[in-house]
Amino acid sequence: MSKNKDQRTAKTLERTWDTLNHLLFISSCLYKLNLKSVAQITLSILAMIISTSLIIAAIIFIASANHKVTPTTAIIQDATSQIKNTTPTYLTQNPQLGISPSNPSEITSQITTILASTTPGVKSTLQSTTVKTKNTTTTQTQPSKPTTKQRQNKPPSKPNNDFHFEVFNFVPCSICSNNPTCWAICKRIPNKKPGKKTTTKPTKKPTLKTTKKDPKPQTTKSKEVPTTKPTEEPTINTTKTNIITTLLTSNTTGNPELTSQMETFHSTSSEGNPSPSQVSTTSEYPSQPSSPPNTPRQ
């Protein structure tokens, strides 16, 4: 019923708030018009009343909102009180403590006093594990380990046979003559041939290729010695034939035989090298005395 009343009041407050806002807007519009003095006074009075009513409505709305919040806190308090009243009894794990069923706060206080008397100077926290039964729930309180550095637990020691098996893992059966432990060990070896060990081949390093080329040996070529061919002696050409002919003509102007010989000599010299006989004949003629020309007698 209280919820319905609160909802109704909230709705009425909202409606009044809206109507008052509309009235204020209308009164402000009418006041701007040029009306008579009496009408303006009445409008101003109405505006003052509406503004005060708006303030009152806002206060009521805030109060109702605060009233809505308070029941929730009361419900929470009631729930907590019910939980405290209906808490079940707790039983401890150790019956030697002699703790009777009671509230959990009393149990924890008694346990802390006992632990403080047995282990002074060590801080310990309680780890409670709840075990649910059909009707009651029991908590098992166990003192936690001290906060000092915990040593790692060593693994449990293995039996002697396994220890020997680990040590003598590669024992061939040929060695065992009358030793029973040796025979037991050599039987446990899986299908592995005795005496052979797996050898890992060393990995070959990749050979680095050198980009530089090997210098080739320079072969010195023997320079050919220029063989000087014997220069052939130039053939004596009788190029100066005009000089000889002029000399001969001056000496043999009157002898027709000499002129014929000179003509034959001139023809042979133009064709090629003269024979030694011709050369000798040409050289002999200047040495001969020139005969005087035959002048006709009168």
Swiss-Prot record:
Residues 64-298 are extracellular. The record marks A65, N66 as: Cleavage. Residues 289-298 have a biased composition (Pro residues). Residues 190-207 have a biased composition (Basic residues). The chain crosses the membrane at residues 43-63. Residues 125-150, 233-253 have a biased composition (Low complexity). It comes from Human respiratory syncytial virus A (strain A2). Residues 125-161, 190-298 are annotated as: Disordered. Residues 187-198 are annotated as: Binding to host heparan sulfate. The gene is G. Keywords: Disulfide bond, Glycoprotein, Host cell membrane, Host membrane, Host-virus interaction, Membrane, Secreted, Transmembrane, Transmembrane helix, Viral attachment to host adhesion receptor, Viral attachment to host cell, Viral immunoevasion, Virion, Virus entry into host cell. GO terms for biological process: adhesion receptor-mediated virion attachment to host cell; symbiont entry into host cell. Disulfide bonds join C173-C186, C176-C182. The keyword Transmembrane applies. This is Major surface glycoprotein G. GO terms for cellular component: extracellular region; host cell plasma membrane; plasma membrane; virion membrane. Pfam families: Glycoprotein_G (PF00802). Residues 1-42 are cytoplasmic. Residues 211-232 have a biased composition (Basic and acidic residues). Belongs to the pneumoviruses glycoprotein G family. Glycans are attached at residues 70, 72, 80, 86-87, 92, 100, 105, 113, 117, 119, 135, 137-139, 141, 144, 147, 199, 203, 219, 231, 235, 237, 251, 253, 269-270, 275, 282-283, 287, 290. The keyword Transmembrane helix applies.
